[in-house]
Amino acid sequence: FFFFFLFFFLFALLPITRRKKYYFIQAYEVNFFDNIIWKLIAGLTYYLPLKKILNSPNLLPHKHDDFIGVVPAGVDLNVFYPKPSNRLLNGHTSIGIIGRKEKHKGTSEIISVLCSLENKAGIIINIAIYLEEVDKQRLIAAGFQVNFFPITSDLELASFYRSNDIMIAVGLIEDGAFHYPCAESMACGCLVISNYAPLTETNSVLKLVKFDACKLGEAINLCLNLDLEEKSKEIQSNISVLNKYDWKIVGETFNSLLLDANK
């Protein structure tokens, strides 16, 4: 982090006019640190003489609302595309999670909710990228079949999404912000439970206002009880939302914003 922030501050001080210095912000970094010094350093970056572009409109506190535009992060829809159908595999329902080491990602909290489900019959848990051994053992002790997938490419990640009937893409901070696992799993034709965009921008019955263990448990049970027509309607609604996040469209939006800013 030290070298990242050092480079960042040096860049801000380069003898280039402010109109040509931009800061594309995908997260409010202050939330990611417990150490007060790192929080302070991260917070100072938002006061640098840079033109701020956000990937979600409500990403920063109001004191930093001097951004010049909002450009959502893009999704490669040639890679993240829907599976042929939302059929159950051998009578089982697969639930997927992108596991992360960072505590604010909420992986352990999600696993706690899964372990507390009353009806665990026929559920397979698929976890990609990161899984602590203690959490794996908790899932096994609860009676789940658990599969772990180390992901090394976007193609593998997209395949992972498509292998699941349900994706849980929730976190503990920045409710409503753009979230790659949420967007990518929506594009891949999964039922998605999330407190992040793009799902929170829809009328989905599976969107959450914030992380809440009880609400998450209710959403999982709702997924498990949807009929085929309800599943299809939810999935098609998710897929239709993703068109505006296609890389081509996002790239054109970003380019137009930069051209206007330099006039």
Residue ranges with predicted function:
Residues N31-I53:
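Membrane-proximal helix-turn-helix segments that form the acceptor-binding/catalytic region
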Residues F33-I36, G69-H92:
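Acidic anion/phosphate-binding donor-loop and adjacent secondary structure
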